[in-house]
Amino acid sequence: MSHSNKLVLFFEKLIFSNRILILTSLILLCAVLTFQGTQVKPEASFLKMLPTNHEFIKNFLSYKKELSNLGNVVRVVVENKNGDIFDADYQEVLKNVTDEVFFISGVNRDGLKSLWTPNVRWQEVTEEGFIGGSIIPDGYNGSKKNLDIIKSNILKSGQVGNLVSNDFKSSIILAPLQDTNPETGLPLDYHQFSKALEDNVRAKYTSENINIRIVGFAKVVGDLIDGAMQVVLFFMLAVLIVLLLLWFYSRCLRSTFAVVICSILAVFAQLGTLNIMGYGINPYSMLVPFLVFAIGVSHGVQIVNSIIHHAETGANKLDAAKLAFRSLYLAGITALISDAIGFTTLMVIDIGVIQELAIAASVGVAIIIITNLVALPIILSFIGISPKAVEYSRKNTHNISLVEKLFANFTKAPLAILTIVVSVGLFSGGLYYSQFMKIGDLDAGAPELRPDSRYNLDNAFIVENYTASTDVFVIMAETGADQCSKYNNLVLIDQLQWQLKNTAGVQDVISITDISKLGMFGMNEGSLKWVNLNRNEFVVNATLSQVPSGFINADCSMAPIIVFLNDHKADTLNTVVNTVTDFSKQYPQDGIKFLLAAGNAG
């Protein structure tokens, strides 16, 4: 007798000699894990979605604080459906929505931008010099005079296409998010954040005149988690379909329920184990329970089929269960361990959510070994297979179904030859076209959601009505301390900016050079001849004395170049990356490096 057979017989004797004790222990264990499984919560993290060891992400994380307004942000659009934004009722709603968003936990309140926040300002050159202020005038009372002032201030602020739509029918509240909830110190709960936006903003302020649109990573995740309830309904439907198919196949109700219950217990035990390990269910791993259930049913059906086969030969229910265990245990555990190892290889992908998916799948497969290869044979050794099912199997043993006859023809010439030829052709075609496989998103908006989902419709509205799109790609121009405003560095930034503006897929590009040019323009009586960079260091410093936050860091060692894209498709991103890379190679310069990449598209 081989070593493997001795091992199987050892486990068979161990399990079936102590089947009451083992089954009781497994029931108690599954009860504990099932309770833990009911406590598992949906979770998502912005950083877990990123390959944190990738060069681009390392560059972003090194300047994460300085670029907080350009990474994980939410845009809330307040649209006037029956007019424009220069309306007293609209401005009242915009003010209230701004306040609502401001007080939602997780919003970085220092970086919040709206027409009603003091960090959004206008500036003008007059005979007396520079004047400026907030968009909303002091003492605002909703009068036509005040609304005219707001219109004038918006036109002077440069926010048209950015915070204000090109048709003046809507405006944006830009809310950068924190990684943690400041009230609890825990990672930001995107589901609760998304729910707060829906309850406190969209549901509260949407009316016959006002439409609220919301986009951003947090909203995508929130919508995906909301969809988890639909996933539960689909799971219940899958269970029902499997019940019907198993009964139709075996004609044994008790074994059908045994297989399905063991597979469901595997799912709950998996969720419970993940909860004990400190993991939750993220939008990418919420479909793993389907996988665990499917694998469990697959192995369960094989066990039931084997028990029926042995019962046909006259074996009693205990002996039939033992023989089925003996014939399938080694093959089953080998297959499941292979599955677990296969899922574990996903750990090499350096993205948190993918690694958690690998852990979830591997844990689920490991638990199937207990619930379906150990517990199920024990259960069937007690309840057995119904005589009706055994008789049904015996009658159909020699009956060949139409489907079997159809596929059997493929083992004979000429269909066998045709099958091989077609297979080789499909393989060759697949091999050829695989070289054109795109990495990344192929459609605009959030590919995780349907094209006609509310989120993607909201995103399409912003792309259509705003110059500054929701897809932002940021290049970090890194210099020495106090060197980002040096003339030579500004010239290189300006040249790269010009090339990017003339790159397919780019809507607009802004950087510190735009601020400096506008400063020169303003300091020289608004003469268009002076819209340029100045070689004099003191003049440059003067032009940047009022630089808005986010255009340089504290010690002027990094200046972001902000690129607004048409979309975040793979082709668009590759084009932008190649433009920056080629520029860096063509114009190497000591003292400045163009680092990729930040922003939600970076």
PLM region descriptions:
Residues 243-247, 264, 280-301, 344, ...:
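Hydrophobic transmembrane alpha-helices
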Residues 2-42, 378, 392-443, 457-460:
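Signature of alpha-helical transmembrane segments and their immediate interfacial
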Residues 276, 293-305, 329-348, 353-395:
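Transmembrane alpha-helices and their membrane-interface boundaries in multi-pass membrane transporters
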Residues 310-337:
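Helix-loop junctions and hydrophobic alpha-helical segments within the transmembrane domains
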Residues 61, 92, 140-253, 491, ...:
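Extracytoplasmic
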Residues 92, 96-172, 177, 189-193, ...:
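Alpha-helical transmembrane helix bundles of large polytopic membrane transport and channel proteins
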Residues 226-281, 348-352:
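Interfacial segments of transmembrane alpha-helices in multi-pass membrane proteins
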Residues 408-410, 414-534:
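Juxtamembrane segments of multi-pass membrane proteins
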